[in-house]
Amino acid sequence: QSFAVYRIPGEKVPRLLTQAEEEIRLIYDLQELNGQKGFVIAPFRVSEMCPVVLIQSDGWGQSLSLDDDTEEEYEASLQIQEQENFQTSYTKEYADCFQAFINALRDGTFDKLVLSRRITMDKGADFSLSSVFRAACKRYIHSYIYLCYTPQTGIWLGSTPEIILSGEKDEWNTVALAGTQPLQDGKLPQVWDEKNRKEQDYVTAYIRSRLLSLGIHSTESGPYPAYAGALSHLKTDFHFSLRDNNGLGDLLKVLHPTPAVCGLPKEEAYRFILENEGYDRHYYSGFIGWLDPNGRTD
């Protein structure tokens, strides 16, 4: 049975959605999300092999309690910490890919490029998805945490500080997230160099232009430092209203993929990543969450 468990930033209690497999809807164009309601699992690149999946549950789902720490959760939190500190030697393929990205930035072809890579790790005999999910909820209190499964996507567990779209009625929000620094003694850094601020300016200008392309005039607040696990990013909030809340698919299509996971200029960076990154991201760096044009979207 398909399901999604997710914890919205600022909330203490995660929610659970389930759906019979025959009810799952597959979507091949983000515009088809217009007027739709359900839990969306969208890939980095929509394709026949990697469609947008919509779990069409009737509501937000039942609440789940996060019990006191168990020994399993303690072990899971250690696994998360080990992965945060995980270092691996560069493979030749990754080194070549990294150099291609650097060269494209240095010659001025792109203002921003986001390179990712795939790492395979042994999960161990006592690995527990539910324990890791609960541990992540407690460790990353400022992030959107999710654990989901459908036959089309397989199992995905993740955490993201970037909320591509949230809101309801006439109050909607998106963010520009760029620039990275480690926390300083667990606190947000207040001094940011020119490189990080310039990167944030690029992304903010992009989000602003994407909204304006749909006739959306927003109010901005920021940039300001925001938590992202053991790191901090510069963040700018965009607040706006929509003429028609049934057009959320149109908005998601112009925003995705965001510069935080792709690059600038968007279309050129997107094609460069597909041609040079060396693997298919599938649902990594896509977007995920509850969509409801007549209720709350997160």
Can you describe what each PLM-predicted range is?
Residues 265-267, 272-298:
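Glycine-rich, small/acidic residue-mixed loop/short-helix segments
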Residues 62-92, 98, 122, 175-274:
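Contiguous alpha-helical scaffold segments within structured protein domains
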Residues 1-30:
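Intrinsically disordered, low-complexity, charge-biased terminal/linker regions in eukaryotic proteins
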Residues 20-122, 127, 188, 194, ...:
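Non-catalytic accessory segments adjacent to catalytic cores
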Residues 113-119, 149-150, 222-225:
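Short, surface-exposed recognition loops or helix-turn segments adjacent to catalytic cores
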Residues 150-154, 223-231, 287-291:
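A glycine-rich phosphate-binding loop feature that marks nucleotide/adenosyl-phosphate handling sites
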Residues 2-13, 122-202, 295-298:
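An anion-binding catalytic pocket shared by soluble metabolic enzymes
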Residues 40, 108, 165, 205, ...:
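A residue-level signal for conserved active-site and pocket-lining positions in enzyme catalytic cores
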